[in-house]
């Protein structure tokens, strides 16, 4: 028990070290591919071909690396949200609605994140990381929802049983037996049927002292009680039946040897028939290439002078183009200066015209005259009013003086 415990601890430590190496090693970037493949396997366990793909023609089968990289954002986002909604419904939330193609992506992602949080899925990223429809976060959400769905439907992973390891001695013995069987006559056309189980070879070695063997089996192993004559008779009886029949295997090269020979003969025959045509064709192609090469040489010799002229013309055109560019720079600067001066002249013209209009216009004088005449009229009106007031005051004064004088006379 202590040795088993030490082995388990050693294995756990090696697994921990191996996981650390994987996380820090160069294979870290390929881990997302493995996670996507695991997602596809989980979807197949959930039978998504009959459940998800039959919801509509817009849902397509998911490839094993579909969500690794973002290629078609709109299609991947719609498929991600739809698959996440289906997994949420599959995990027990039947009231969850499937998203539509024209729904608000922010609200759709918020609903998916809320449903994942309700199922105990811890997320350390925002919903904006899922808008691309692909990547590590998308695969994490889908994997977590797929795990929750598998738990809800009651799926359980079976423990892997490793194959038994054979000892080297056993492998050597089997190899020796195979070598010995090669010397035995093969009958590939005579195959054993299921009914041949009745003809099982039974070796009955009669020996004395069976009771003694049952009581003391180790003693029977150390000392043989078999008679040589009985052994020889049993060998003569069983020897004719010791014939090995090999079942026909489609992968055995011996079965395809005849077919390979016939195909080889057919290929040789076809090569013999097609060979002359190929030789003639190669000769014709060689002649055509020679004619093309000679024609090319003659054209080059004929057009050598024209090509030299063309090169000189090209050089001249390049020089003229450079000169034109240099002149264009000066013209453009002068054009800008001319435009600026023209704007200044236009402003001066406008100022001169405004000043002339002000000096030649008699409207202010007319306004002044009208104002003076109006003032004169108002002055006359005020003079009349002043005279009326003075008259009324004088009348009042005279009346009061007259009354005062009359009162004095009456008193006296």
Curated annotation (Swiss-Prot):
Coiled-coil blocks: 302-393
Function recorded in the entry: Component of the intraflagellar transport (IFT) complex B required for transport of proteins in the motile cilium. May be required for ciliary entrance and transport of specific ciliary cargo proteins such as che-3 which are related to motility. Required for the formation of chemosensory cilia that detect chemosensory cues.
GO CC annotations, alphabetized: axoneme; ciliary basal body; ciliary transition zone; cilium; Golgi apparatus; intraciliary transport particle B; microtubule organizing center
Oligomeric and partner information: Component of the IFT complex B composed of at least che-2, che-13, dyf-1, dyf-3, dyf-6, dyf-11, dyf-13, ift-20, ift-74, ift-81, ifta-2, osm-1, osm-5 and osm-6.
Gene name for this UniProt entry: che-13
Taxonomic source organism: Caenorhabditis elegans
Domain of life: Eukaryota
Protein name in the entry: Intraflagellar transport protein che-13
Annotated GO biological process: chemosensory behavior; cilium assembly; intraciliary anterograde transport; intraciliary retrograde transport; intraciliary transport; non-motile cilium assembly; protein localization
Record's note on what induces expression: Regulated by the RFX-type transcription factor daf-19.
Family, per entry: Belongs to the IFT57 family.
Subcellular compartments: Cytoplasm, Cytoskeleton, Cilium axoneme
Effect of gene knockout: Worms display defects in ciliary structure resulting in defects in ability and osmotic avoidance behavior. It also affects the localization of IFT complex B proteins, osm-5 and osm-6. Shortened axonemes of all classes of sensory cilia in the head. Required for mating.
């Amino acid at each position: 028990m202590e040795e088993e415990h030490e082995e388990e601890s050693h294995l756990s430590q090696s697994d921990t070290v191996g996981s650390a190496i994987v996380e820090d090693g160069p294979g870290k970037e390929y881990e997302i591919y493995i996670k996507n493949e695991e997602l596809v396997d989980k979807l197949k366990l959930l039978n998504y071909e009959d459940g998800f793909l039959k919801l509509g023609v817009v849902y397509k089968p998911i490839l094993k690396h579909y969500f690794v990289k973002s290629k078609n954002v709109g299609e991947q986002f719609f498929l991600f949200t739809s698959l996440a909604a289906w997994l949420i419904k599959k995990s027990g939330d039947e009231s969850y609605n499937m998203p539509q193609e024209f729904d608000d992506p922010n609200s759709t992602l918020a609903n998916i994140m809320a449903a994942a949080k309700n199922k105990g899925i811890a997320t350390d990223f925002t919903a904006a990381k899922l808008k691309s429809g692909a990547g590590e976060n998308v695969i994490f959400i889908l994997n977590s929802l797929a795990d929750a769905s598998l738990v809800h439907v009651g799926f359980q992973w079976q423990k892997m049983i490793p194959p038994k390891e054979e000892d080297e001695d056993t492998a050597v013995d089997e190899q020796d037996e195979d070598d010995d069987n090669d010397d035995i006559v093969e009958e590939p056309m005579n195959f054993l049927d299921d009914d041949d189980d009745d003809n099982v070879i039974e070796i009955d070695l009669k020996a004395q002292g069976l009771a003694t063997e049952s009581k003391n089996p180790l003693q029977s192993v150390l000392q043989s009680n078999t008679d040589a004559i009985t052994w020889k008779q049993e060998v003569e009886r069983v020897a004719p039946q010791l014939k090995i029949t090999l079942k026909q295997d489609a992968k055995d090269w011996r079965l395809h040897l005849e077919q390979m020979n016939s195909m080889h003969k057919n290929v040789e025959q076809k090569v013999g028939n097609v060979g002359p045509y190929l030789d003639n064709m190669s000769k014709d192609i060689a002649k055509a290439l020679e004619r093309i090469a000679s024609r090319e040489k003659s054209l080059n010799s004929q057009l050598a002078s024209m090509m030299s002229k063309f090169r000189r013309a090209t050089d001249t055109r390049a020089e003229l183009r450079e000169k034109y560019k240099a002149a264009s720079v000066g013209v453009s600067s002068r054009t800008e200066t001319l435009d600026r001066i023209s704007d200044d002249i236009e402003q001066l013209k406008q100022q001169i015209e405004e000043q002339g209009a002000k000096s030649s216009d008699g409207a202010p004088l007319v306004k002044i005259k009208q104002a003076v005449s109006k003032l004169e009229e108002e002055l006359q009106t005020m003079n009349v009013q002043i005279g009326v007031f003075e008259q009324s005051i004088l009348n009042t004064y005279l009346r009061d003086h007259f009354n005062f004088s009359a009162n004095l006379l009456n008193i006296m």
